[in-house]
Amino acid sequence: MSNILRKVIENDKGELRKLEKIAKKVESYADYMESLSDKDLQAKTPEFKQRYQNGETLEQLLPEAFAVVREAARRVLGLYPYRVQIMGGIVLHNGDVPEMRTGEGKTLTATMPVYLNALAGKGVHVITVNEYLSTRDATEMGEVYSWLGLSVGINLAAKSPAEKREAYLCDITYSTNSEVGFDYLRDNMVVRQEDMVQRPLNFALVDEVDSVLIDEARTPLIVSGAVSSETNQLYIRADMFVKTLDSVDYIIDVPTKTIGLSDSGIDKAESYFNLSNLYDIENVALTHFVDNALRANYIMLLDIDYVVSEEGEILIVDQFTGRTMEGRRFSDGLHQAIEAKEGVRIQEESKTSASITYQNMFRMYKKLAGMTGTAKTEEEEFREVYNMRIIPIPTNRPIARIDHTDLLYATLNSKFKAVVADVKARYEKGQPVLVGTVAVETSDLISKKLVEAGIPHEVLNAKNHFKEAQIIMNAGQRGAVTIATNMAGRGTDIKLGEGVRELGGLCVIGTERHESRRIDNQLRGRSGRQGDPGESQFYLSLEDELMRRFGTDRIKAFLDRMNHDDEDIVIKSRMLSRQVESAQKRVEGNNYDTRKQVLQYDDVMREQREIIYANRRDVITANRDLGPEIKAMIKRTIDRAVDAHSRTNRKDAIDAIVTFARTSIVPEETIGAKELRGLKDDQIKDKLYQRALEIYDKQLSKLRDQDAILEFQKVLILMIVDNKWTEHIDALDQLRNAVGLRGYAQNNPVVEYQSEGFKMFQDMIGAIEFDVTRTMMKAQIHEQERERATQYATTTAAQNIQSQAIGADFDSSADFSRVERNDACPCHSGKKFKNCHGRKAF
């Protein structure tokens, strides 16, 4: 073990020596750059661009370019990057992560690699976790870039597509991680090239990279559309039933946070809904609503997992930052179940049109780099998933913060009493205190106790984060007491007020350990910036969430040794801190394994998404006739249909092929079995294909000119691709839930998902080609639409393309015995089974 540790330390030292060598080269240009006039310094940008065009690499330009930015920052901002910041900038340019402590000037460090990479003219994206930081950094650092002749854009959610396009065309674009992801998805849903806003993804520099690429790695970005639904009453009824249950009627698995009805709960459900068997196929919709109502009532907690806004909206709380996640909703009906639980307006269910995780979004950039103060604990994940190394950068001044040993109490009550007493003592001597909590609920509780103790304070949590930067800025003033959820206010420095250094600097008090050591380190790092004095102290109790879920038997043994009559007794032990850390490592390991598994599943979707999006983009950007592609689809559709039916006896095969031809290729009265009898399969294929080509030419002759034909072809393909892709996303989601159970049969769920997902993708491609064929052959192209065929709108597309073949008679005699809840209903209504006959009993 010690050999491995020594090797790691030596590797880090060797890396730092290399960085220092390049940094000294940058510093060697300092006097020369200082001697240049403003005009000459600004002229360096076009000079570098020309040299890059002439074949010099960015690595060759680096020392000089970094020196130019240093001098420009000194003249424009009055700030001059230190050597450690130059080293951090080199690491960023190499596509790695410099671990730089809080207050070491990460924002200024980024200016050097951002400027250098912007010289290539392919765009640089600086990614931050919220719009406040994007706007602040773009405004402050943008002065340097603008002064040096580079354009800077800010991409905000509220901007129009035209404004977004302009922002992305700039040399440097500031944006949030979510907005870049949503823009990528929306770009792959448009029908005209001019509606796209992004350029190809080149270089992203992610601020607080651990927050985006680790904490939010599993978060899918979802673009969805509302599905018309009459399910609100069903959510309310399921909620009313679940609220009648006793604790023996359901079973909760605490570590995995899963829940299900017990036998007594099933009996109650059957009685409440007047059913003979809750798990009968006909009740598949009902079990879905009941499962969600159970989760909403007994797993999802108000002020921890979500808050209710003043407007009566359910807002998700980010478990890592404590911020509310505006515009995000729990999926698969859970959000509606929570709305029913809280008695607020139930919003419509939505259907996913496009989705991507941050893991796959950021892996699409040609080069990816990031900055953070705490990433070493996740080094393996950064290396394996993103191919990024973590390089710890030394601080400019030694750290003077004192980190005290954790204090452990028996109960939550005794722990909070001790926290309030500590805060009061420090407040009375004027030392500023930042109290960090894991949940909104805890911050409200401590706030209440501080009010009772007569201590004035500010609360920063998911309920009022719009004031967060202001509150955090004042947290270092004399006598300031601030309560903050987790890492709220991250990215904003806490500067010490007058006389605070003499009092010991800012004291950070953690009210419990987070399940990730990194988050605890971030909280500690709020104190002691740039060599300032400071303190940190964590208070724990045996009733904390981490202890209850993952505490070891050795920790629990402490409780037995305690004097139960005196709950205020406190344990202070290094060994205890190590035990807590090992519990955290276990959780981090579990979380990493989960993220790795999510990535394995998501890679299946990624490969398929890239194929669909590449083909889609090819259609959108096409200036050529798409006839060859459409004809190839028609040919494959005919071949598939004939091959599929030729396996039955010949008479039945001919009848089936005739039915296919009548419904999908030719006018009904123009073909009969007689015509095809006696022909071989290849002859039938050729005959049908020739007939299809005649109809194809006839259809296109109704359109005004070549532009109208191209627009029609594009709309035809894109409309069907988008529709089928949306259905496929939903189907993959259901498959993923289903294969999880196959582990019990000794089958690897990921392998099963990959093979079945591939087969479903092949089927989807076949379905796209079939629908393109059928719609092309059967569409009614109205005379009055000719003049408007070049003006795309989804409504025009729907008017231009009205397929006679789509839709079948309602079949009330269908067999429902083997139908899954997300399958198409056998009655041919066009709805999913769960939204049609699967709902009937409910």
Curated annotation (Swiss-Prot):
Q: Which GO terms describe its biological process?
A: intracellular protein transmembrane transport; protein import; protein targeting; protein transport by the Sec complex
What are the annotated GO cellular component locations?
A: cell envelope Sec protein transport complex; cytosol; plasma membrane
> Which UniProt keywords are given for this protein, alphabetically ordered?
ATP-binding, Cell membrane, Cytoplasm, Membrane, Metal-binding, Nucleotide-binding, Protein transport, Translocase, Translocation, Transport, Zinc
Q: What Pfam families does this protein map onto?
A: P-loop_SecA, SEC-C, SecA_DEAD, SecA_PP_bind, SecA_SW
- Where ATP binds, per the record, is at Q85, G103, E104, G105, K106, T107, D493
Subunit structure, interactors included:
Monomer and homodimer. Part of the essential Sec protein translocation apparatus which comprises SecA, SecYEG and auxiliary proteins SecDF. Other proteins may also be involved.
The record's comment on protein family reads: Belongs to the SecA family.
What is the protein's known function? Answer: Part of the Sec protein translocase complex. Interacts with the SecYEG preprotein conducting channel. Has a central role in coupling the hydrolysis of ATP to the transfer of proteins into and across the cell membrane, serving as an ATP-driven molecular motor driving the stepwise translocation of polypeptide chains across the membrane.
Query: What is the protein's given name?
Result: Protein translocase subunit SecA
- Gene name of the record: secA
